[in-house]
Each structure stands twice: as structure tokens, then as C-alpha cells.
């Protein structure tokens, strides 16, 4: 289930729009997550990963960054990641069309709170079980969600690091993995060439032997 949706400007973390689950009990529980989301917005910058998943206990944050705007959603951990990112992409398309040009000029928090109407409508579409099945089939072209950076929200907030630092570590690991694969490929090629050379030497020696001893 989609429980909390927030949109913020990356440059300064200014909240632009938000929508929270209307259920009273969930509303009380979600205050902590809303606070975490605001802290997260303040840590974002131009070098932050543009797609990220952050574990938060029984809940999960997902966000995307497009044109300097962060679109974030809080879901139950069991909610499909693919649908969560498809939901965020839908919000981005509509929000950018309606308010994209005005984003750099606003200074008041929640200047586009009226966007909640579209958020609520889209959220219902993704929560409905039948609609979710349909969305699952039409979004097969969505980017590979397995490649999206994954972290823990508490660790990110407590460590005090900008998300760009985490992104750098992820990139470093990716580079090391790529180098390992390249080195392994190089060693395999050398091994193959060595075997071929040994076979070639054997046949050359055989030819020389036959020529000098049998002819």
C-alpha cells in the first residue's frame, strides 16, 4: 500500500506537495516517516543517486529525482518496487507538466498542495488489485529495478553523509566489480593462448621429427 507521498525541491529540500494516508491510526504512525522524509530531502544534492530505495523497518521509501525535483513515496515493504517506481514516474510526468516551470521561483512550503488531488487519484489506481495487475503488464519496459541503489534510512540519516557519498561508494563497488570481470577475462584469454601455443609447438616438433627421421 502507498502510505505517504512527498515532492520536494532538491536544491534546498523545500517541500512542494504531499499526500498522507487518511486513516487516523496510520496518520499517527506516519508522522515519524514524514519527519524522516524531510530530513532526507535536506541531504539530497545534484550528485545524489536519481533512483533509490531506503528500508525503514516494515516500510520502504522509494524516490526518483527529475529536473531538480525529488518524488518520494513510502510503501509497505511488500509493495512491489516496480509499481512504486512506475507510480513515481507518473507523478513526475504530471507534476512537471503542471508546475515544472514554477518550481525554481516558489519560496513557500507546499506551494503546490493542490497537486494532492492528482496524487490521490493515482494512488487509488496503484492500490487497486486489478489495476495493479494491469500496470504490472504494461510497465515491463520500466528500467531494471534491481539496479536501483538500496540503503537503510536510519543509517543514512544517522551517519550524516550526503547521499552523494553513498552513491560514490556504490559506483566504486561497481568499478571494482567491472575491473574484476575484465581481469578475469584477460586471464582466461591468456590461458587459452597458452594452451594454443603448446598445441602449436607440439605439432611443429612432430613435423620436424617426421621430416628429419623418416624422410
From Swiss-Prot:
Main location: endoplasmic reticulum
CDD domains referenced in this protein's UniProt entry, alphabetically: Longin, R-SNARE_SEC22
v-SNARE coiled-coil homology domain segment(s): 134-194
Topology feature Cytoplasmic, residues: 1-194
Cellular component terms per the entry's GO annotation: endoplasmic reticulum membrane; endoplasmic reticulum-Golgi intermediate compartment membrane; Golgi apparatus; melanosome
Molecular-function GO terms, alphabetical: SNAP receptor activity
Full protein name: Vesicle-trafficking protein SEC22b
Species of provenance: Cricetulus griseus (Chinese hamster)
Amino acid at each position: 500500500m502507498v502510505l505517504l507521498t512527498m515532492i520536494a525541491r532538491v536544491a534546498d529540500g523545500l517541500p512542494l506537495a504531499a499526500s498522507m494516508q487518511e486513516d487516523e491510526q496510520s496518520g499517527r504512525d506516519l508522522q515519524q516517516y514524514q519527519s524522516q522524509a524531510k530530513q532526507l530531502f535536506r541531504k539530497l544534492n545534484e550528485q545524489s543517486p536519481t533512483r533509490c530505495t531506503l528500508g525503514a523497518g516494515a516500510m520502504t521509501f522509494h524516490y526518483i529525482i527529475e529536473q531538480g525535483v525529488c518524488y518520494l513515496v513510502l510503501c509497505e515493504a511488500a509493495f512491489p518496487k516496480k509499481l512504486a517506481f512506475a507510480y513515481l514516474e507518473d507523478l513526475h510526468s504530471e507534476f512537471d507538466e503542471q508546475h515544472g516551470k514554477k518550481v525554481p521561483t516558489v519560496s513557500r512550503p507546499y506551494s503546490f498542495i493542490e497537486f494532492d488531488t492528482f496524487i490521490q487519484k493515482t494512488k487509488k489506481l496503484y492500490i487497486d488489485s486489478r489495476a495493479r495487475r494491469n500496470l504490472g503488464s504494461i510497465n515491463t519496459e520500466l528500467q531494471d529495478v534491481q539496479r536501483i541503489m538500496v540503503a537503510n534510512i536510519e543509517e543514512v540519516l544517522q551517519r550524516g553523509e550526503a547521499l552523494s557519498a553513498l552513491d560514490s561508494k556504490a559506483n566504486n563497488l561497481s568499478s571494482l566489480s567491472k575491473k574484476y570481470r575484465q581481469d578475469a577475462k584477460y586471464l582466461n584469454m591468456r590461458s587459452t593462448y597458452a594452451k594454443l601455443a603448446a598445441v602449436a609447438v607440439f605439432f611443429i616438433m612432430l613435423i620436424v621429427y617426421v621430416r628429419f627421421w623418416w624422410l
